[in-house]
Swiss-Prot record:
Keyword Membrane: yes
Family that this chain belongs to: Belongs to the PsaA/PsaB family.
Protein name: Photosystem I P700 chlorophyll a apoprotein A1
Residues bound to phylloquinone: W694
Protein species of origin: Trieres chinensis
Keywords (A to Z) from UniProt: 4Fe-4S, Chlorophyll, Chloroplast, Chromophore, Electron transport, Iron, Iron-sulfur, Magnesium, Membrane, Metal-binding, Oxidoreductase, Photosynthesis, Photosystem I, Plastid, Thylakoid, Transmembrane, Transmembrane helix, Transport
Cofactor binding note of this UniProt entry: P700 is a chlorophyll a/chlorophyll a' dimer, A0 is one or more chlorophyll a, A1 is one or both phylloquinones and FX is a shared 4Fe-4S iron-sulfur center.
Record field: transmembrane: 73-96, 159-182, 198-222, 294-312, 349-372, 388-414, 436-458, 533-551, 591-612, 666-688, 726-746
E.C. number: 1.97.1.12
Example of a GO MF term: 4 iron, 4 sulfur cluster binding
Principal localisation: plastid
Length: 752
């Protein structure tokens, strides 16, 4: 890489910290709304409490100083980490004190996990199911037990110490959040030093993180899991530190430990192949990925990330400059290319957050799919309720993060975008042909919606008329997903060329053998047919509509033909003032509001598809002579090709467990199912009525209070249009997710 003379004179990185930046004042914090001159005056109307919640974390509205905003975000991150460590501590504390972890560890196939016991008050102890191993408790589906097994935890005492460690880390994070805001607050230059941040995050956070994790797996998790797999009782296994300090003990399990570090320094790395493996496939004892493969994977990643963490130029005048990379990134048809993006990403945290949320959301969705296709932890693949829970969980998180990415992209456009600094770069060029983008995307949505839904309407009609031979199905007019089948086949065959020494395929979802653990199917080839082709096009439709709404909100955040001065109205506004009809629901906030409904649609179809497909074609039992019996007997291919089939054979048929749960350990799910339906229906009251109706009602109620001489000091006000939509949306999503959660879990627990 070429180094210019100006780069050679790059000034050394200094430590940019301001001492005693902000006074620690409990008296100030005790005043509600202290961050806003208007809110600090106290409530005059009930709108005050809404504005308090809306603006508490909107640091942009509290100060115009980018440095102050940066410090607040940085400090808030430590608060977030404190909450996460506290949550982790709580999970481990429950595992240590209220769980059947030891019993589960001794027989993970037939004993269910539980880490919560309900107290016998008003008869609610009925929720304590008999999960096996002489334990009654609420069956949990979080996957913690399987993860603890993979980490090499063999007793509740170890969980207890981790819980204490989590508490200490939580307290440390709280202290760090206070210290780096009040005592030693970083200056703006520190936050904007992209190269140093990249080096430290890549080499430190990811590189050393992966290295320490692979170190833990090699020295502690691998030997303990090898003994557990061999049937050694947990209480007979040496304590973790003994594997760390006793090389002889390790060498009994992995002979290459006898050779020490000599093979490492002489380049004979193949000597370590007894614990750094490349087997592929799943461990037949546990149904999870080979732990030695996982250790190898993290070691390789750590090397890559540590290398990557030395790529960027800081004190030593060598390495990449982020600004130069971006400004050099231009082609013959892209104008100024990425010029101006460096300034955007170092002055707008909304722009950076938008990218990070979109990436993390996508990553969460990728994780959801890897969790079942390549189950990472021992015995997780045969715990169907946990598999369904984790898939649903990661899909929801992915959906919310992607929508959040669009939200902050739009906030960036409204608050931080400067057109003069972005002339003819890629962002400007996208904005200038936004009409072409959105109109084409709209056409794609109409095409996908009409055709994918049309296939189902056709099938329902043909089935209703008794003409099965004219339906789109594997037995009549076939619509085979030939490209998906081709991709599956490539992935099945590829390891033969790319990893010739691997023992098995990357994932049995692509093809290969049936992996079973204790007579239950962990993973097997997932055959795709007409039913999958049809529902995948529904996925394409719902995702494209979500993208259409969100992208329109970003691209038209500053202006549109309807509202040319939209940037002046801000991110969130109900309508463009009185006298301008037809301008409501056009703010960027409203696009996020509408996008969330379609995100809900998208994720619902995905998790319904997954739940039914796995029960129909993967999950089930296998006899010693190879006879497979799936939970719903392979009915997905013939039933899911009609809308009636989805309603009758999935929603109604599989809702029987939650509907009939009263009087059983699953009865809480029956109550949640009912309550969540109510919360969902309650949302419609906010979504289908206007502010004026409620204001009139409130004024009549206030009149009655005045008549009786107990009128409130704080004047009641109806929710604003935006507030009403926010409350409606929150209840719609909460009700919908609660309904799906209870429906899935009552069903999954009964089939696990």
């Amino acid at each position: 890489m070429a180094i210019s003379s100006t780069e050679r004179r790059a000034k050394n990185v200094q430590i940019f910290v301001e001492k005693d930046a902000v006074e620690t004042s409990f008296a100030k914090w005790a005043q509600p709304g202290h961050f806003s001159r208007t809110l600090a005056k106290g409530p005059k109307t009930t709108t005050w409490i809404w504005n308090l919640h809306a603006d508490a974390h909107d640091f942009d509205s509290q100060t115009s100083s980018l440095e102050e905003v940066s410090r607040k975000i940085f400090s808030a991150h430590f608060g977030q980490l404190a909450v996460i460590f506290l949550w982790i501590s709580g999970m481990h504390f429950h595992g240590a004190y209220f769980s059947n972890y030891s019993a589960w560890l001794s027989d993970p196939i037939s004993i269910k996990q539980s880490s919560q016991v309900v107290w016998p008050i008003v008869g609610q102890e009925i929720l304590n199911a008999d999960v096996g191993g002489n334990f009654q408790g609420v069956q949990t589906t979080s996957g913690w037990f399987q993860m603890w097994r993979a980490e090499g935890i063999t007793s509740e005492v170890e969980l207890y110490w981790i819980a204490i460690g989590g508490l200490i880390m939580s307290a440390l994070m709280l202290f760090a959040g206070w210290f780096h805001y009040h005592k030693a607050a970083p200056k703006l230059e520190w936050f904007q030093n992209a190269e140093s941040m990249m080096n430290h995050h890549l080499a430190g956070l990811l590189g050393l993180g992966c290295l320490s994790w692979s170190g833990h797996q090699i020295h502690i998790a691998l030997p303990i899991n090898k003994l557990l797999d061999a049937g050694v009782a947990p209480q007979e296994i040496p304590l973790p530190h003994e594997f760390l300090i006793n090389r002889e003990l390790m060498a009994q399990l992995y002979p290459s430990f006898n050779k020490g570090l000599a093979p490492f320094f002489s380049g004979q790395w193949g000597e370590y192949s007894d614990f750094l493996t490349f087997k592929g496939g799943l461990n037949p004892v546990t149904g999870g990925l080979w732990l030695s493969d996982i250790a190898h994977h993290h070691l390789a990643l750590s090397v890559l990330f540590i290398f990557a963490g030395h790529m960027y130029r800081t004190n030593w005048g060598i390495g990449h400059s982020m600004k130069e990379i971006l400004e050099a990134h231009k082609g013959p048809f892209t104008g100024e290319g990425h010029k101006g993006l460096y300034e955007i990403l170092t002055t707008s945290w909304h722009a950076q957050l938008a990218i990070n949320l979109a990436m993390m959301g996508s990553l969460s969705i990728i994780v959801a799919h890897h969790m079942y296709a390549m189950p990472p932890y021992p015995y997780i693949a045969t715990d169907y309720a946990t598999q369904l829970s984790l898939f649903t969980h990661h899909m929801w998180i992915g959906g919310f993060c992607v929508v959040g990415g669009a939200a902050h992209g739009a906030i960036f456009m409204v608050r931080d975008y400067t057109p003069a600094n972005n002339y003819n770069n890629l962002l400007d060029r996208v904005l200038r042909h936004r009409d072409a983008i959105i109109s084409h995307l709209n056409w794609v949505c109409i095409f996908l919606g009409c055709h994918s839904f049309g296939l189902y309407i056709h099938n329902d009609t043909m089935r209703a008329l008794g003409r099965p031979q004219d339906m789109f199905s594997d037995k009549a007019i076939q619509l085979q997903p030939i490209f998906a089948q081709w991709v599956q086949n490539i992935h099945l065959l590829a390891p033969g060329t790319t990893a010739p020494n691997a023992l098995a395929t990357t994932s049995y979802a692509f093809g290969g053998d049936v992996v079973e653990v204790g007579g239950k199917i962990a993973m097997m080839p997932i055959k795709l047919g007409t039913a999958d082709f049809m529902v995948h096009h529904i996925h394409a439709f719902t995702i494209h509509v979500t993208v259409l709404i969100l992208l329109k909100g970003v691209l038209y955040a500053r202006s549109s033909k309807l509202i040319p001065d939209k940037a002046n109205l801000g991110f969130r506004f109900p309508c463009d003032g009185p006298g301008r009809g037809g301008t409501c629901q056009s703010s960027s906030w409203d696009h996020v509001f509408l996008g969330l409904f379609w995100m809900y649609n998208s994720i619902s179809v995905v998790i319904f598809h997954f739940s039914w497909k796995m029960q129909s074609d993967v999950w089930g039992t296998i006899t010693p002579d190879g006879n497979i019996s799936h939970i719903t007997g392979g009915n997905f291919a013939q039933s899911s090709i009609t809308i009636n089939g989805w309603l009758r054979d999935f929603l109604w048929s599989q809702a029987s467990q939650v509907i009939q749960s009263y009087g059983s350990a699953s009865s809480a799910y029956g109550l949640i199912f009912l309550g969540a339906h109510f919360i969902w229906a309650f949302s419609l009251m906010f979504l289908f009525s206007g502010r004026g109706y409620w204001q009139e009602l409130i004024e009549s109620i206030v009149w009655a209070h005045n008549k009786l001489n107990f009128a409130p000091a704080i004047q009641p006000r109806a929710l604003s249009i935006t507030q009403g939509r926010a409350v409606g949306l929150a209840h719609y999503l909460l009700g919908g997710i609660g309904t799906t959660w209870s429906f899935f879990l009552a069903r999954a627990i009964s089939i696990t």
